[in-house]
């Protein structure tokens, strides 16, 4: 009888562990996510957004007709640092949210619409800048110099 109790408690313990792992994995944002939802559900992103002070501001005209795809992982420390910085800078420049596409990726760097594969994402975060549906540049994982300098390098050379 004691072995039955031991097996029963072992089963309950194992089941509770697997259930909590599933919940943790499923709590990540995968696919399209709004800025509001990101900040409401992931406090670290909101805190990093509030703490970041953009450097030398860029001319908002540089962003004319630019679509920005932000492919990131909630689970990624680089994403937790860089995504809020980009969003703060874009907000400071009054870039409309409909030009900003936040796409949460899983650990395999993909999501249900396969945009991780489409954009050939190897590292997160990756910021992809498109004009007329053609890629004009990207920032992978973190800026080379600074966010502002890298954006000026990418967008400043466009007509």
What kind of region is each of these model predictions?
Residues 64-74:
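Short active-site neighborhood of thiol/selenol oxidoreductases, capturing the structured segment around
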Residues 92-96:
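Short helix-capping segments at alpha-helix termini
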Residues 123, 129-159:
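Non-catalytic, surface beta->alpha helical segment in thiol-disulfide oxidoreductase systems
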